[in-house]
C-alpha cells in the first residue's frame, strides 16, 4: 500500500522528506480525527436514546440510504463487522427502531426497515450529521470546497479505473 510519502514523490510535489513525513502522519490521523470528533458530537444523542455508537450508525445508515436494506449491505458498504451488525440489529429490533421483513421470492434475504418509533432519533441524527458537516467545512470558501470535492471525485474515478483494469 502506498503511503503519503510515496504519493508526494509520485505526484512530483516539491517537498522535503520531513514535510512528507508530516503529511503522512496527518493523513493517517485525519480519518481517526474525523471519527473521534463525530463520535464525540454523537455522545449526547446516544445518551438521550441509550444507544451504542454502532447501533446509531446502523440506524442512520438505513435511514440515509434506503437503497441498502440488509445486514449484508451494512457489512459490505459500512465495513462494520458482521458480528457487530448482528448484535446491534438485534438491539434495534428489540428497541422497536427497526423491523425485519422477509424479501418476497428469497426467504434467505431479510430487509431491515426503520419504524415510526425511530423517526425522532433519525430526525435528530440527521440534524446532527448536517451540523457536523457544516462544522467540518467552516472557514473554507466555496472555491476551496468545490476544489476539494472535484479532487475527491477524480481520485474516486481513478480508483474505479485501477480496480477495473486489474
Where would I find each of the regions flagged by the language model?
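Charged, amphipathic alpha-helical coiled-coil/dimerization segments
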Residues: 14, 91-149
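C-terminal regulatory/oligomerization modules of transcriptional regulators
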Residues: 1-21, 143-166
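N-terminal leader segment of winged-helix/HTH proteins
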Residues: 1-49, 95
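Short, locally clustered residues in the helix-turn-helix/winged-helix DNA-binding domain
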Residues: 35, 60-66, 126, 153
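Alpha-helical transmembrane segments and membrane-interface helix-loop junctions
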Residues: 71, 75, 111, 157, ...
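N-terminal helix-turn-helix DNA-binding core of bacterial DNA-binding proteins
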Residues: 40-84
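Pre-recognition alpha-helix immediately N-terminal to the DNA-recognition helix
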Residues: 30, 57-60, 120
